[in-house]
Amino acid sequence: MALALTGWQLVWGACVCVLVHGQQAPPGQGSDPGRWRQLIQWENNGQVYSLLNSGAEYVPPGPQGSEANSRVLLAGAPQAPPRRRGGLRRRQAPSLPLPGRVGSDTVRGQARHPFGFGQVPDNWREVAVGDSTGMARARTSVSQQRHGGSASSVSASASAFASTYRQPSSFPQQQFPYPQAPFVSQYETYDPSTRTYDQGYVYYRSASGGLGAAAVASAGVVYPFQPRARYEEYGGGGGEEQPEYPPQGFYPAAPERPYAPQPADGLDRRYSHSLYHEGTAGLEPAYPDPGPDAAQPNGGGGGGTYGGGGGDPRLGWYPPYGNMPPEAYSPPRVVEPQPPFRVLEPPYLPVRSSDAPPPGSERNGAQQGRLSVGSVYRPNQNGRGLPDLVPDPNYVQASTYVQRAHLYSLRCAAEEKCLASTAYAPEATDYDVRVLLRFPQRVKNQGTADFLPNRPRHTWEWHSCHQHYHSMDEFSHYDLLDAATGKKVAEGHKASFCLEDSTCDFGNLKRYACTSHTQGLSPGCYDTYNADIDCQWIDITDVQPGNYILKVHVNPKYIVLESDFTNNVVRCNIHYTGRYVSTTNCKIVQS
């Protein structure tokens, strides 16, 4: 028993000695201030960087003399060597050490500003930023250090971070006038002096005829990037035959244009005759249409620079028509400007003719409207055209529904006579429920003139409930017809709204608003009435369930002149169940 107790005491004593001895770091390892203790890696813009620190990770408060000698190293790229005076050198990849070079010597590559603005000064030596070659060495050295490396391995890894070596090329180098380094994404400043590739790269010609590049690093890292091919290499190399065409610049030189007289006002009106000028029959067109006779500009034979190949002579100065003489200048005619809209031909206007009028027909232009002037149609309306209101049937069908509301919430609409006659009876109370068939409306002016109210401005009516002026007595009629007989089953009303440009097609400007002086509807614009505004309904409180027809008629009395009155009515099939409605088959009809 005593022998066993003595043995256990010896074992515990040995353990205590080992622990005490382990806390004392041998020189050159834990107490070595030059040892790298921390490694931080991150990636920025596709490049991996490393930050090495010889200090401790956690520093206690207070002055620490041992941490004052700690070092910090940022690794990840070769550093910049002195620039040669002969010209600007490309950025080089790390390579194997040269024969006879000591490991402590360094060859700095050309470092660049992180944003590409020129070169980094040479005095910025301690910290270098670049490609990920140093990171491969960082991982190698750190792994060696973690697996029991000695102080010599630590110093070797430190020198690996701060050094980049070059290797002589195993292939014969070829000089190129304008090389492009594979790792530089920014454009460098042009230097007229001679440029060559660095010896650190190995350029080889692939089987496809292009050039490839491989950077052989000391860590065995191969970069798969290749330089951009130049003009000389599109034809291939080696046994392939180069084309006989001489090299040319990025922008080919254009042939010199012959002198053409300029008009007095400096405006070029060669393309305006067929669009805006009347009476062009007496004038020769600026560009004749290409035809069999125009196939050979040089008289069907040779001559000229390009041999007079066939084609469109209006191509002007571009080959193969560079030898075409300039067209003769024709003085402009004073004409009335036209709106850029295509007016629709109403049925009561004469049939358009594509034949040009005789030369003497310009004198009768005041009595007869021009029927065909290029692609612009001008009827005898003093060049102003007419509006054309068209309601949108899909807009009506999309949002038709039934609403039940108390009469006290419809007082403003009652003042404008938007309810059925039973709502104005003496026995009606504010708590009576009215059933309303609500639907939206969107009207477009697809004509060539403004749709303006027929009433003078000083006669517009002010409605205090809705806070706007009514410029028309009857802009729309809303009626509900029986589907079988076509008779009215609900007391529709005359919607009297203010006219404005709610929205416009692309290229058209809104010019009218719901104010006391600017009401109307511009060409290419829409006057929209949502289903939730007052009077945008039909009172169907007294209507029985069944099938009906909803009729929306715009400009019903034809008071404002339009170019087409056959597209002012929308009809929809309504199925009313007593609780809700379903709307189908909304379309534009004549009446």
UniProtKB/Swiss-Prot annotation:
GO MF: copper ion binding; protein-lysine 6-oxidase activity
Gly residues biased stretches: 298-313
One GO process term, biological-process aspect: collagen fibril organization
Positions contributing to Cu cation binding: 466, 468, 470
Cofactor remark: Contains 1 lysine tyrosylquinone.
Propeptide: 23-91
Pfam families in alphabetical order: Lysyl_oxidase (PF01186)
Keyword Transferase attributed: no
Disulfide bonding pattern of the chain: 412-418, 465-514, 498-504, 525-535, 572-586
Signal peptide boundaries: 1-22
Residues annotated as site: Cleavage: 91-92, 130-131, 147-148, 213-214, 354-355
Region (Lysyl-oxidase like): 387-591
InterPro entries reported for this sequence: LOX-like_protein, Lysyl_oxidase, Lysyl_oxidase_CS
Cofactor(s) needed for function: Cu cation; lysine tyrosylquinone residue
Superkingdom of source: Eukaryota
Segments of skewed composition (Basic residues): 82-92
Covalent cross-link Lysine tyrosylquinone (Lys-Tyr), where: 494-529
Entry keyword annotation includes Aminoacyl-tRNA synthetase: no
Family: Belongs to the lysyl oxidase family.
Quaternary structure, from the entry: Interacts (via propeptide) with EFEMP2. Interacts with FBLN5.
Protein known as: Lysyl oxidase homolog 1
Originating species: Bos taurus
Classification of source organism: Eukaryota, Metazoa, Chordata, Craniata, Vertebrata
